[in-house]
Amino acid sequence: MSLLTEVETPIKSGWECRCNDSSDLLVAIASITGILHLILWIFDRLFFKCAYRRFRHGLKRGPSTGGIPESMREEYRQEQQSDVNVDNGHFVNIELE
C-alpha cells in the first residue's frame, strides 16, 4: 500500500462538530462569546483612529473657565503664550565630560 491510500478524505458528515462531553448550553455560550469578541475586535480596528483620537484629545482640554472674569482669562492666556515664546530660537548645549 502507498501512503496516499492511507490518508482519509473527509466527507460532508465528517466536518460536523459533535461535542458529546459537554452540555449544549456551554457550547452555545462559547460560540456567542467568540462571535461577540470577533465583532468587537473588527469595530476596534475600524474605528481605532476616530475613537482614540477623540478620547485622547478630550482629556487634554484646558482648565474650566466658568465663573472667572474675562480679564483673568486673558491674563492666563498671555501667561501661557509667554511661557511658550520664552525659548524661541534658543538651544541649550549640554556637554558631557
Swiss-Prot record:
Task: Note how its activity is modulated.
Answer: The M2 protein from most influenza A strains is inhibited by amantadine and rimantadine, resulting in viral uncoating incapacity. Emergence of amantadine-resistant variants is usually rapid.
Q: How does it sit in the membrane?
A: Single-pass type III membrane protein
GO BP terms, alphabetized = protein complex oligomerization; symbiont genome entry into host cell via pore formation in plasma membrane; symbiont-mediated suppression of host autophagy
Question: What are the boundaries of the region Disordered?
Answer: 60-82
Q: Do the record's keywords include Transmembrane?
A: yes
Residues lipid-modified (S-palmitoyl cysteine): 50
Site location (Seems to be involved in pH gating): 41
Q: Name one Pfam family in it.
A: Flu_M2
Residue numbers for the site described as Essential for channel activity, possibly by being protonated during channel activation, and by forming the channel gate and the selective filter? Answer: 37
Residue ranges, compositional bias (Basic and acidic residues): 71-80
Localization, per the record, is: Virion membrane; Host apical cell membrane
Q: Which residues lie on this side of the membrane: Virion surface?
A: 1-22
- Indicate where the modification Phosphoserine is found in the sequence: 64, 82
The record's GO molecular-function terms, alphabetically, read: monoatomic ion channel activity; proton transmembrane transporter activity
Q: List the GO cellular component terms.
A: host cell plasma membrane; membrane; virion membrane
**Membrane spanning segments where?**
23-43
Similarity annotation: Belongs to the influenza viruses matrix protein M2 family.
Notes on the domains: Cytoplasmic tail plays an important role in virion assembly and morphogenesis.
What role is this protein assigned?
Answer: Forms a proton-selective ion channel that is necessary for the efficient release of the viral genome during virus entry. After attaching to the cell surface, the virion enters the cell by endocytosis. Acidification of the endosome triggers M2 ion channel activity.
What else the UniProt entry mentions is: When the channel is activated, one or more imidazole moieties of His-37 probably become bi-protonated.
| Name of the molecule in the record | Matrix protein 2
Its ancestry begins with:
Viruses, Riboviria, Orthornavirae, Negarnaviricota, Polyploviricotina
